[in-house]
Structure formats: C-alpha cells, structure tokens
Amino acid sequence: MAKKVEAYIKLQVAAGMANPSPPVGPALGQRGVNIMEFCKAFNAKTESMEKGLPVPVVITVYSDRSFTFVTKTPPAAVLLKKAAGIKSGSGRPNTEKVGTVTDAQIQEIAEAKAADMTGADIEAMKRSIAGTARSMGLVVEG
C-alpha cells in the first residue's frame, strides 16, 4: 500500500547551506521530520550548484514521518541579477535602469529553467524572462 501524504512544504533554501535554523528547522520540526537527515540529503543533492544560490524545494511529508523532496531551478529574478552583475533590482523599473542583459543571457536562463516552466516553447519562456528582467529595471538588448 502506498504511503499516505501528510503535507507538502515549500521552502527556498540556499544551495549547499541547509541547516536546522529557520526556515528549515521550524517548518520540518512541526511535521516531525528528521531535520538533519533532510539537511544532509539536500546539501548532497545541491553540492553541484553554486553555493548560496536560493533553490526552491518541495518536501513531501508522509504519515510515517518519512519524506521525499524535489528541488527546482533558482528563481528567474536571481539568475537575472547574477547575469547582470547587480545586487538588487530597481525600485522604479520604468524610470531607473540598473543594468543590462543580452538576448543570449535570456536564452541561457530560459534553457536552464525549461524543466520547471510550463511555457509552450522556448520563445514563450524567453518572453516571460525578458518581462521579468524589464520589471526589475534591466534593459534587454537584442
């Protein structure tokens, strides 16, 4: 018989840096999940990623307190900030531009996020990411 799903927990955890402190500890602790077991498994799975990059993770907790988790790709905004070499987006995106990204960089981000995005094709994903870039105050070249 299949295990009964008790909860889904969605978190954003820095790649390779999961530890029992908030937000991981309290979210898993209240469900009775072994926090250190999750931290070790998550850090092992994300060791190939750039350390510190926020990674969305969906944890499925079962009635016997076991768990499974699925990692997603980092948010588009984080990847865009990294590509443009900026710390944060613009407070006034339509008037104050803070950086530029090229069409090639947007293509690269769209390909990286293709597994998580539900866009029909790569062009639709590129348009979505370009829109995110513009809303952050980035100039899209190309």
Swiss-Prot record:
It comes from the Bacteria. SMART domains: RL11. Gene3D superfamilies: Ribosomal protein L11, C-terminal domain, Ribosomal protein L11/L12, N-terminal domain. One or more lysine residues are methylated. Keywords: Methylation, Ribonucleoprotein, Ribosomal protein, RNA-binding, rRNA-binding. The keyword Ribosomal protein applies. Pfam families: Ribosomal_L11 (PF00298), Ribosomal_L11_N (PF03946). GO terms for cellular component: cytosolic large ribosomal subunit. InterPro entries: Ribosomal_uL11 (IPR000911), Ribosomal_uL11_bac-typ (IPR006519), Ribosomal_uL11_C (IPR020783), Ribosomal_uL11_C_sf (IPR036769), Ribosomal_uL11_CS (IPR020785), Ribosomal_uL11_N (IPR020784), Ribosomal_uL11_N_sf (IPR036796). GO terms for molecular function: large ribosomal subunit rRNA binding; structural constituent of ribosome. One of its GO terms (biological process) is translation. HAMAP family: Ribosomal_uL11. Part of the ribosomal stalk of the 50S ribosomal subunit. Interacts with L10 and the large rRNA to form the base of the stalk. L10 forms an elongated spine to which L12 dimers bind in a sequential fashion forming a multimeric L10(L12)X complex. Belongs to the universal ribosomal protein uL11 family. Forms part of the ribosomal stalk which helps the ribosome interact with GTP-bound translation factors. This is Large ribosomal subunit protein uL11. It comes from Vibrio vulnificus (strain YJ016). The gene is rplK.
